[in-house]
């Protein structure tokens, strides 16, 4: 690029009547070219994924340096049509212009929290559900809502469903999660029988409620 001189010499066909003409010149200006920067619109990503070469992958038709904004490694908040920008500086600055701002749009989808909830150990009838059973965790802060709720006493039975819904604190970047389940077995309880040794009796005294007075912690029938 720059100002250049063009020259020409002319030889006439009819040299008998015409002289040659030498060194006729003109000036020409060669302007710098503007590089063609190509940058395909990146596919949507999920919140938590840092920007990298998959998204920041502009190319040009001449060698040079790309500077991206936001930079590689940035974690964008969730949202549609967020602007990514790149500036391009050509290596051959004598013949190419810089390209200050090429942009594309990217969508960042909300992330779905990862809920971890191991199946609880079996419990015995009469044990209320509590933190030992209702102990799901998530990879982001939030609130768990259990069904049945803490304090519930389940009837005995195998493979009973416990369910939890999770509402993240950061609703801008995370989805809610519903219907995560585990199974719990509630074993039958063994009644507690209380029966104090009766006082001595005399031979011939018939056994009665005075001696046959066992009690249990649940309703039922005693057979002596």
Regions found by a protein language model. Give the residues of each.
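Solvent-exposed beta-strand/loop surfaces, strongest in extracytoplasmic domains of secreted
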Residues: 1-224
């Amino acid at each position: 690029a720059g100002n250049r001189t063009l020259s020409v010499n002319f030889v006439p066909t009819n040299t008998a009547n015409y002289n040659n003409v030498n060194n006729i010149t003109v000036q020409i200006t060669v302007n710098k070219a503007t590089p063609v920067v190509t940058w395909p619109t990146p596919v949507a990503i999920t919140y938590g994924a840092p920007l990298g070469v998959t998204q920041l992958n502009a190319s040009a038709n001449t060698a040079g340096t790309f500077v991206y904004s936001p930079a590689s490694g940035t974690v964008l908040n969730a949202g549609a049509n967020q602007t990514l920008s790149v500036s391009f500086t050509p290596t051959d600055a004598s013949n190419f212009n810089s390209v200050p701002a090429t942009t594309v749009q990217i969508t960042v989808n909300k992330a779905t929290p990862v809920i971890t909830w191991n199946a609880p150990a079996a419990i015995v009838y009469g044990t209320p559900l509590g933190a030992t059973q209702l102990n799901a965790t998530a990879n982001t802060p939030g609130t768990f809502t259990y069904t049945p709720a803490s304090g519930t006493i389940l009837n005995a039975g195998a493979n009973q469903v416990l369910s939890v819904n999770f509402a993240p604190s950061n609703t801008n970047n995370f989805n809610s999660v519903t219907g995560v389940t585990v199974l719990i077995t509630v074993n039958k309880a063994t009644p507690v029988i209380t029966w104090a040794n009766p006082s001595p009796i005399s031979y011939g005294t018939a056994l009665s409620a005075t001696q046959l007075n066992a009690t249990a912690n649940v309703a039922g029938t005693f057979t002596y």
